[in-house]
A protein has these predicted regions:
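PLP-dependent aminotransferase class I/II
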Residues: 26-79
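Short, conserved loop/helix-junction motifs that constitute active-site signature segments
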Residues: 20-23
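Conserved PLP phosphate-binding loop immediately N-terminal to the Schiff-base lysine helix
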Residues: 1-18
Length: 79
């Protein structure tokens, strides 16, 4: 979860997890546009994962009603 990575002033990437050859088997990266672009309360984010992991996540999302409001989605696209 890299929700607060934009508040870290150290130079360079926050980690080297994606350099591990087996990252696709276990790693899911989460990011929050809500924090980075000050979209407080709009719950807009992104996920980076291997295609197989994303397919599993999509199965879950098909069973729950989760959606950021349109204002937050548009602000994230604009930001």
């Amino acid at each position: 979860d890299e929700t607060y990575r934009d508040f870290d002033s150290r130079p360079g990437p926050p980690h080297d997890l994606f350099t591990d050859p087996g990252w696709a088997d276990t790693l899911i990266q989460l990011y929050s546009f809500s924090k980075a672009y000050r979209l407080t309360g709009h719950r807009v984010g992104a996920m980076v994962a291997a295609p197989a992991r994303l397919a599993e996540v999509e199965k879950f999302l098909d069973t729950v009603a989760i959606c950021a409001g349109q204002i937050g989605q548009r602000a994230a696209l604009w930001g």
